[in-house]
Amino acid sequence: MKKIRILGISAFFHDSAVSLIEDGKIVYASQEERFSRIKHDQAFPQKSLRDLLSYNKIELNQIDYVVFFEKPFLKFERLVETYLAFAPRGIKQFLSAMPIWLKEKLFMKKEIIDQLKKIDHNFDEKKLNFSEHHFSHASSAFFPSPFKNAIIFTADGVGEWATTSVAIGDNNKIKIKKEINFPNSLGLLYSAFTYYIGFKVNSGEYKLMGLAPFGKPIYSRLIKDNLIDIKSDGSFRPVSYTHLR
């Protein structure tokens, strides 16, 4: 019986990586930095993808589906709408950033296809799929788990729009039930503290996490009173954004 193979790709953000699923089982996963020796390498994972194919003794055309971890067009929409919401503030940065966004977000599908065709110039473009960011997080948590049914909680900086989500996992299906959207993000607040104490955003958060047990929560009340508004239902919004309106 023919195996169903799914190639997962994460790239162009931080810690680019690939994984291979065969008949529902993860048989390979690696980060590009292991091959490029560039910490948190965000480039398309060419080297790790080639190793994936070599290790599993398969060709790219033997893969049934290729899935990218987010939907770039929706992220591009958020970037544009966010700048327009605060216009004319930041117009110079907006105009200088637009060419980069057009290349990295709006035309990312073409970039991914071009990269895959470097390995196999006959790559079938119809095999390429895009999953919403939080759906990818939920899937990576639920499907490898021992549970047939579960509530799935996801919280990060931001995906396309969602920063926090709750989903229901039921056998082979996942349904997002509730989302909190950008700019309301505990993850971005955490990144702000990461930057404040001198670490790099999207890199040093784990260091802050490692330091946390050695400290005392003497500023927790100050943070709750001045930086974030926590509602009775558990939802939240940063109070510090209001002065930008």
PLM ranges: what are they?
Residues P144-L188:
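Active-site cavity-forming subdomains of large catalytic enzyme subunits
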Residues K3-I21, F153-I168:
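Gly/Thr-rich phosphate-binding beta-strand-loop-beta motif of the actin/hexokinase/Hsp70
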Residues F12-D41, I174-I180:
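Short glycine-rich, Thr/Ser-proximal phosphate-binding strand/loop in the N-terminal lobe
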Residues K2, F130-I152:
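Conserved phosphate-binding catalytic cores of ATP/NTP-utilizing and phosphoryl-transfer enzymes
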Residues T242-H243:
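Conserved small/polar residues in nucleotide/adenosyl-binding loops
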Residues R37-Q46, R50-D51, K173-P217:
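Glycine-rich phosphate-binding loop plus the immediately following alpha-helix
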Residues E59-I113, S139-S140:
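Short beta-strand-loop/turn "lid" adjacent to the catalytic site in phosphate-handling enzymes
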Residues D51-Q62, L116-H121:
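Phosphate/pyrophosphate-binding loops at sites that engage ATP/ADP/AMP, CoA/4′-phosphopantetheine
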